[in-house]
């Protein structure tokens, strides 16, 4: 599963809408990834979609 580095997150929302597993949601003013839903997009995409769309490098990272 992946996680979001909250100190780097700009709360733009790009990742929430791109996640094919609906694993990303807003909690207490920032986005979080539900590890029970995150599949790292294996079998769906070459790399996790949250990583692909996040405008800030190294914000969506392996947990």
Curated annotation (Swiss-Prot):
Binds 2 [4Fe-4S] clusters. [4Fe-4S] cluster 2 binds at residues 38, 41, 50, 54. Residues 2-29 form the 4Fe-4S ferredoxin-type domain. Its cofactor is [4Fe-4S] cluster. InterPro entries: 4Fe4S_Fe-S-bd, 4Fe4S_Fe_S_CS. Keywords: 4Fe-4S, Electron transport, Iron, Iron-sulfur, Metal-binding, Repeat, Transport. Transmembrane segments: none annotated. [4Fe-4S] cluster 1 binds at residues 9, 12, 15, 19. One of its GO terms (molecular function) is 4 iron, 4 sulfur cluster binding. Ferredoxins are iron-sulfur proteins that transfer electrons in a wide variety of metabolic reactions. This is Ferredoxin-1. It comes from Rhodopseudomonas palustris (strain ATCC BAA-98 / CGA009). The lineage of its organism: Bacteria, Pseudomonadati, Pseudomonadota, Alphaproteobacteria, Hyphomicrobiales.
